[in-house]
C-alpha cells in the first residue's frame, strides 16, 4: 500500500519553530510530528510514503533518509511548483500512487495527531465498498468547522456544511482518508480542494463513507492546540503504553522524558510535559504543560508552564516562562527574567522581562 502526506505550506502558525525546520519536522512527544504518522502507516503494511510538499523539500528528504532504512519504508517527495490545495497534490503524485495494483491508498494531513487506527480504517473501507472513506471526529463546537452530515445507519456521507449557523451535526473531517485509485480520475492538476470539490462529487454518487475516529484527535498546527494535543497524546500513552512514561517522586501526572535527558534533584515535573533528547533540567525546576525540545537546558529553580522551549535553548536560573511563551531555536533567557507569552525568534538573548504577549525579533 501507498500513502500521501499533505505537507504543504510554510507553517506560519507555528513560527518561530518553523523558521528552523519545516513544520512536519517540529518535535512532538520527543520525535518529529510526521514520524508518528509514518510509523503508524508502516505498521499496517504501507511500503511507500509520498510527501506532497512545496517548501524546503531537500531538508525534509535529507532528514527522513535516516528513517527510510530504520523503518524499512520508501519515502519520496512530490514537489509542487505552485500551491495546489488539498487535491491537486494527488494529481501531481498520480504516477506514484496508482501502481496498477488497485489497492486503496491513504491521504493524511500532516498536522493531525491521533491514535491512527489505520487497520480499522482499512477494514471499514473494504466492508462498506465505497470509493472513498474519510475519518470524522466529534467536536463540541461544530459551528467553527466544516461539518460532515452522514447517515448513522449506513455511514454514508450525505453532504458537507461549512461553519453551520444551525446545528446539523457534530462530526468534522479529521484529515485522514482511504481512497480507491479511481478517485485520481476525478482530480485535475490545478489548485483544487479535496474537501470542497472532490468529496462532494463522490458523495453525490453515493460512494463516500465516514468512519468515526475512536480515541483522541487534534490539529496541532498552532501553539495552543499543540499543547492540548500533547496532553491528549500523553493520556493515550498512559492507556496504551504506560511503560514509556516517566515515574518517580518528582513526576506529577503524565510525563515523557527521553532516556538521554538529565533531570536534577528536587524538581517537580508534570502534568503533561515532554523533555526531549539531550536536555538538561537542573535542580529545583518546575515544569508543567510544556515541551522542552532536544538539547535545551533549564537552569536551577526555573519555572515553565504552558510553553514550548525550542531546540538548544536555555532558560536561566529563577526565570519564569508561561502563558504560551514560544522560544525558537537557540534562544537564551537570562537569569530571573519573566516571559508572559513572549514569542521569541531563533538565536536571541532575552535580558529583560516580557510582561505581555509579544513577538521578540
Swiss-Prot record:
It catalyses: alpha-D-mannose 1-phosphate + GTP + H(+) = GDP-alpha-D-mannose + diphosphate. Diphosphate binds at residues 9, 11-13, 23. It comes from the Eukaryota. GO terms for molecular function: GTP binding; mannose-1-phosphate guanylyltransferase (GTP) activity. SUPFAM superfamilies: Nucleotide-diphospho-sugar transferases. One of its GO terms (cellular component) is cytoplasm. Its EC number is 2.7.7.13. InterPro entries: GMPPB_C, GMPPB_N, Mannose-1P_guanyltransferase, NTP_transferase_dom, Nucleotide-diphossugar_trans. Pathway: Nucleotide-sugar biosynthesis; GDP-alpha-D-mannose biosynthesis; GDP-alpha-D-mannose from alpha-D-mannose 1-phosphate (GTP route): step 1/1. Keywords: GTP-binding, Nucleotide-binding, Nucleotidyltransferase, Transferase. Disulfide bonds: none annotated. GO terms for biological process: GDP-mannose biosynthetic process; protein glycosylation. It is an enzyme of class 2 (transferase). GDP-alpha-D-mannose binds at residues 6-7, 85, 109, 111, 146, 173. Belongs to the transferase hexapeptide repeat family. Catalyzes a reaction of the Smirnoff-Wheeler pathway, the major route to ascorbate biosynthesis in plants. This is Probable mannose-1-phosphate guanylyltransferase 1. It comes from Oryza sativa subsp. japonica (Rice).
